[in-house]
Amino acid sequence: MEIIDRFTNLEYGKVRYSITGEASDNLVVLMHGLTTSKDIYNNLTQNLIEQEFQVLSFDFYGRGKSDYVPNVDSENLYVNQAMELIEKFIPTGAKRNINLIGYSAGGSIASMVADRLENCASLILIASTGVPQIPTSPVLISLLQTFESNGEISSELKHEVEKQMVQELEVLEENETKDLALKVYNDLDIWNEKTIDTVKNHLLSTGGYVGDKSMNSIFESIGKKNIPTFIMAGSNDNWVSPESGKEIHKLIEGSLFFEFEDVTHWAFLEKPEVYHRKILTFLKSA
């Protein structure tokens, strides 16, 4: 089935989204990462609709083709965006099983949405942020420090960041997933002023990697509400340490955790068949 992109106006601007698959009691909502767009989920979307799930995917403000919002100072902007969009597809009083999947920075947002929803059937976190941690890559640490000091990104640092991105693309063995990752990054236009501002403010709104703004109470609340939660991490992730996943697992009582050996931050693009199988198995059991 073709993924058809549409646009809708929400409180803070125009948002690109797609809702794919036949109407179903089981809705899966996909939330992308800090520097990606909804397109990162195209292959997973097809797998999900083949299993009779309906899939809602969208670009966060300032990413993909959604409107840029300046001066973001809280992740609540993105949480409210997700809630507003979900409510557009859930008639008042209707009961649907809403399953949330969050990747990277989208994981912490998905967690906050799960805690707010009255009918969250399950939560899947992939290489998720949400607890204090330092990336293993010196290049990324330098970029974060530049953001936190409100400094200018030097041409040397830009070169090193681009070099690392190219190196990480090499782990993607399948041409289809590599082409998809390249498209996402090319569309992002990473050094565009608005893109830099969006990424910087999103990071700083969470307290950055040092975690000045704790989410522990959110994760603990998810556990108390008995929301089935599956957490996945990769042992070679340079962007979000697998220790983050382990810590979130401890905070969400009753959650499941799996660490993929030798897998990077690309996660489901690097090992699509394995990730997709585990995701579908969990969704069907939740």
Please tell me what each predicted stretch does.
Residues 1-29, 50-53, 90-91, 121, ...:
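Alpha/beta-hydrolase fold catalytic core
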Residues 225, 231-233:
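Short beta-strand/loop motif that positions the catalytic acidic residue
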Residues 238-244:
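Conserved alpha/beta-hydrolase "acid-adjacent" motif
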Residues 239, 260-272, 276:
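Catalytic histidine-centered segment of alpha/beta-hydrolase-like enzymes
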Residues 60-101, 105, 277:
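Active-site loop/oxyanion-hole signature of alpha/beta-hydrolase fold enzymes
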Residues 115, 123-155:
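Flexible "cap/lid" loop of the alpha/beta hydrolase fold
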Residues 19-67:
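Conserved HGGG/HGGXW glycine-rich cap/lid loop of the alpha/beta-hydrolase fold
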Residues 134, 155-223:
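Conserved alpha/beta-hydrolase catalytic His-Asp/Glu region
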